[in-house]
């Protein structure tokens, strides 16, 4: 069996995940290899704005637009830790590159740069991440828990969090409300 690599892809939760954390989620896969996968849910916001988060961290945000940018709930793992998905990649401490332009950073230096208007051009800030052990994501895919599609920067950074899942579904030519809870194999 050939290994798949879903780095820089979206995972679209199938309706059968209705009762789980991942119900109706769109997850961006930042890294996927033989050791497992790491991603961020990109369509579930918290009640916290990026401006409030930075202020709570003792920073003085300079950009008023940060008050309208919600902090996302990136996943059920390490929900007390912040993660910044951004373009361009840049030279931050603790950055994982998903592709040549998109990075995931988990260090305070990028948040300070955002507060000082010196950060990356495009950002999503999340608390927590989504993680899969080796082979776990592949098993969930075989059980029809997810649809996959190559990610698009436009969906991540230009659409509101509410618009992201329908836009990713549209890439597959599918309306989310037409999906069935039933699975089958041809």
Swiss-Prot record:
Domain of life: Bacteria
Pfam families linked to this entry: DUF179
GO CC, alphabetical: cytosol
PANTHER family in alphabetical order: UNCHARACTERIZED PROTEIN YQGE, UPF0301 PROTEIN YQGE
Entry similarity comment: Belongs to the UPF0301 (AlgH) family.
Name of protein: UPF0301 protein Neut_0448
């Amino acid at each position: 069996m050939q290994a798949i690599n879903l780095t820089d892809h979206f995972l679209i939760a199938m309706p059968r995940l209705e009762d789980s954390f991942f119900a109706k989620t769109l997850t961006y896969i930042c890294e996927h290899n033989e050791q497992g996968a790491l991603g961020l849910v990109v369509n579930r916001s918290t009640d916290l704005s990026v401006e409030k988060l930075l202020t709570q961290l003792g920073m003085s945000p300079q950009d008023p637009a940060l008050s309208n940018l919600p902090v996302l709930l990136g996943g059920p793992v390490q929900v007390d830790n912040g993660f910044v998905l951004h373009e361009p990649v840049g030279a931050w401490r603790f950055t994982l590159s998903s592709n040549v332009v998109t990075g995931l950073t988990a260090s305070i230096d990028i948040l300070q740069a955002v507060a000082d208007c010196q950060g990356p051009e495009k950002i999503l800030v999340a608390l927590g991440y989504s993680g899969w052990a080796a082979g776990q994501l592949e098993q969930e895919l075989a059980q029809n828990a997810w649809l996959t599609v190559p990610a698009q920067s436009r969906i991540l950074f230009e659409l509101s969090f509410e618009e992201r899942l329908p836009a990713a579904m549209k890439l597959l030519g599918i309306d989310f409300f037409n999906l069935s809870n039933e699975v089958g194999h041809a």
